[in-house]
Design a protein with these regions (language model features):
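Hydrophobic transmembrane alpha-helices and their immediate loop junctions
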Residues: 6-209
């Protein structure tokens, strides 16, 4: 039967759909960044999205805001499409196909929600930094505040992952700990890179005046 044929491939289709959803999420960042003249050096992917690596800081708070919000908006749109497909086609879809569609709708909403957390360098953290930047007109200060929040969030994930691990959820606990360490490292590194760029800019300006 069609259902029996689809069941063995359900996990494969879910995994493929998740991977493609993350790719679209990150490509949305890249397209908006290119529109603002910001080249993307690379993208680091992980289970709940990714982090775009740029050669330089965004030219303005406005450009960072739109680049950061593009990914979550893309995920919300994709999730909405899968949700509508599930609602309208539930009566005629085979059960395994319906399960995959439901999963992809849910995972895209989760992807958007997680990335909108105000923890730098997640998308939400970049949105928050752009708001602070626009408010104080000080990128260094905005990055320092956002980076501290990102660091705190990383520590929180590590603690929750440890509790989950010792509570019996071994795989889930390990995932949260790994993501927490990634967040911790990325948030600190982002601020250090900004300080280095500012120092190099100051050195170049000093040499130009010699």
């Amino acid at each position: 039967t069609p259902c029996g044929t689809l069941f063995p491939y359900t996990t494969l289709f879910r995994s493929l759909g998740l991977f493609l959803s993350i790719i679209v999420h990150e490509l949305s960042h890249s397209l908006v960044a290119r529109n603002f003249g910001m080249p993307i050096k690379g993208i680091t992917l992980f289970i709940f999205g990714g982090v775009a690596e740029m050669n330089d800081e965004p030219p303005s708070a406005k450009s960072e805001f739109f680049m950061a919000i593009a990914g979550p908006l893309a995920s919300i749109i994709i999730g909405g499409i899968f949700f509508l497909v599930n609602v309208t086609g539930q009566a005629i879809m085979p059960e395994p196909a319906g399960a995959v569609i439901q999963y992809l709708a849910l995972i895209n909403f989760v992807l958007a929600g997680f990335n909108l957390l105000p923890a730098f360098p997640l998308d939400g953290g970049r949105v928050f930094r752009s708001i602070l930047w626009a408010w104080k007109k000080n990128l260094k200060w905005a990055t320092r505040i956002s980076s501290r929040i990102g660091t705190g969030f990383g520590v929180l994930l590590i603690v929750l992952g440890g509790l989950s691990f010792f509570g019996g959820n071994i795989v889930g606990g390990i995932w949260w700990v790994l993501i927490g360490f990634f967040m911790l490292s990325a948030s600190r590194m982002s601020y250090q890179q900004l300080l280095l760029r500012k120092a190099l800019e100051g050195e170049q300006i000093g040499r130009a005046h010699v």
